[in-house]
Amino acid sequence: MHRTAALSIAILTAVSCGSGCTTRPYEQDYQQRVADFRGAAVFAPLAQDPTEFGNGRVALRLPSVLEPPKEDDGTKIRVLPPFVRQFPGFVAAYEKLIVMSNNMQLPVVLTIGAVPVAEQRFSEVESAILEQVRRDESFPKVDWERGRSVEPMAGGPAMWDVLSLSGPQEFDSKPTGEPEIKRWPGRCEIWVSADPKQEVCTVLALRAPDDVADQLPVTVTELIELAARTVQPVAAAAVEQPADAPAK
């Protein structure tokens, strides 16, 4: 090979390597920015930061549309699903009272529980929930969908068991005054974390009447799945006794 040709090849190789070495970090940074942007867009219906409940037993990003329940005569009725009055490890509930065209208000409610596995395994939690739900006239034959896989964003549980309940169910349809409990077509999803290595079993229940569900940023199923993906693991040292659930 002529010296001139060899020199040209060497120069081209150096230029190509230099260009590749220069652009590769930029491309990686760009791809990471795109991934971060897409992730932020997916979780846009949730608050930016997680909220801790039950003295740190569970932490997750709440749906931003929800807020602490208003204190009135119907609060204790609304914060728990009517078919799970004994809610395992109850720690908190958040709600949104949505005004309908006739000025009636209907609640969308997220109920949160945290059960240390040293006290009760997730399979026992599920049995306790299912036994109660099947007593409701709308759901006598429902059963768990087991092994719903999600991609956790904070190292939390990747496996959940899900109870999907669509049909007439009780809602407080007049939460600004005397409670008026009526059966409305609605949807409730109950998610129980089923990670075999978890130290705390997280229980999430999201309910919405069909008449106001379209005012949520995404569907009930999508919203509770997003929240479940943000559940953060809890150290055993932080686990304490669960809070008492509201009175029946």
Task: Please provide the spans of the model-predicted regions.
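Envelope-exposed proteins and targeting segments
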Residues: 56-58, 62-64, 106-108, 186-188
